[in-house]
């Protein structure tokens, strides 16, 4: 009788557990052996959602349960240490991932999430700002003995930072019906002027305001008050 009771209890618990509704199918060309980990941050603590040990195959499949679109982390370990990791926007359904072992982050490609498509566009533009910034730094070194030239470069650097900030603001407002908007604003604009955060938050649709990143953005802007 007791045995039947515990068996019934296990069945009930299993039936109440959320079913996996997100699947990441991946292929890391060149990988022969290693561990691939799917993780996310919960209240600042990284939690492993799923993992798989690979030995002789570069392909894998990882699964978890999502309540809404959110940023996940894919990590690769070899010889017991973390070697590479990349963040991406996961959504309910199937996401396909491809990359090269030697250029894990640089050649990564995610398909299946509309939020990730927008994040890819955002990162492409952000990388252009980073390249411009590096070019200015190289020029600063080149003209380190020319104060007049350095003053000009410094002004251009300030303008570059402003252009980058306004790009992020406009991107957030233009994508106000996507979780990407409060995520980007909360990550890159938390130290900016309060009025910009208010403008972005007020532009969000109700669904996005109630999302994980909408709630976080609200907390960030209220903390600044």
Go through the PLM ranges and name each one.
Residues 1-4:
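Positively charged n-region of N-terminal signal peptides that target proteins for export
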Residues 6-8:
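Sec-dependent N-terminal signal peptides
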Residues 12-15:
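C-terminal motif of bacterial Sec signal peptides marking the signal peptidase cleavage site
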Residues 17-102:
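Start-of-domain marker
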Residues 66-71, 77-211:
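Preference for long, solvent-exposed alpha-helical segments and helix-linker "stalks"
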Residues 190, 214-225:
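TPR/TPR-like alpha-solenoid helical repeat scaffolds
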């Amino acid at each position: 009788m007791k045995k039947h009771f515990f068996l019934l209890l296990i069945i009930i618990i299993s039936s109440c557990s959320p079913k996996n509704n997100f699947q990441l199918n991946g292929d890391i060309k060149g990988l022969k052996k290693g561990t691939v980990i799917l993780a996310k941050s919960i209240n600042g603590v990284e939690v492993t959602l799923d993992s798989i040990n690979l030995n002789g195959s570069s392909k894998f499949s990882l699964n978890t349960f999502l309540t809404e679109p959110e940023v996940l982390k894919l990590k690769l370990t070899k010889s017991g240490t973390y070697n590479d990791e990349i963040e991406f926007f996961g959504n309910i359904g199937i996401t396909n991932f491809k990359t090269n072992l030697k250029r894990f982050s640089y050649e990564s490609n995610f398909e299946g999430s509309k939020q990730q498509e927008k994040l890819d566009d955002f990162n492409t533009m952000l990388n252009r700002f980073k390249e411009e910034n590096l070019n200015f730094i190289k020029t600063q070194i080149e003209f380190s003995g020319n104060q007049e030239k350095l003053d000009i470069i410094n002004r251009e650097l300030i303008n570059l930072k402003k252009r980058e900030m306004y790009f992020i603001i406009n991107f957030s407002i233009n994508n106000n019906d996507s979780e990407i908007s409060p995520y980007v604003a909360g990550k890159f604009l938390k130290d900016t002027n309060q009025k910009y955060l208010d403008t972005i938050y007020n532009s969000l649709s109700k669904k996005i305001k109630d999302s994980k990143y909408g709630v976080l953005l609200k907390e960030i802007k209220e903390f600044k008050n």
